[in-house]
Amino acid sequence: NTSLPDSQKKYASNGFGYVGAPNYAAGYALAEEAVKRAKLQAGDSVFVWGLKGQGGDRGQRTVGVLDAFTKAGAKVIYQEIDAATNADPNAGTATFVGVMGANPGIKIVVTDHGGLTSNVGVYAQAAGLKAGQVYFAGFDMSPNTAQAVKDGFQNLVIDQQPFLQGYLPILNICLTKKYGFSGLDINTAGAFVDKANVDAVAPLAAVEIR
């Protein structure tokens, strides 16, 4: 679900589209919403654990997060997700504990990675944090993420609605083949999940509809 804007522009009339989350916009929106909900003040510290170093469109989601926090006047502590943690989120536990221990005033943590987002309960408890002590925001619903929301560790998640990401591209191909339609361009990341609506979303996340 990473866009290819140059190819899309060139081949849109032939059915080339994009169904997913515009990465920069999704990152910016998540951080902006976290700023409001956590009542962040200028000068407060935030920890962004991201993939800026990947570059390209994927790296833009982290850039969006960083830009929103910078605009809010936050003190940003950034940590690139290393290869080991990217492959196995549990491998990042020591990194998280180290960052939080060195920066005890962190108010918001953003994990720009679905696997890390699903693991925030493990990270928080390893760092000695109680539920709600730090505001966690991240990307992608999963059963573990839903449980972390229910437990009070995960506060805010952008839901990318993976059913739409799988269904609509196939529909796009069929419509292009049958009717010559141009490519669809659809943002599937329009919803936030939190404790107020997680009970409705969790069963759908378990079967990868949400």
Across the structure, where does each feature detected by a protein language model lie?
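Hydrophobic alpha-helical
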Residues: 65, 83-148
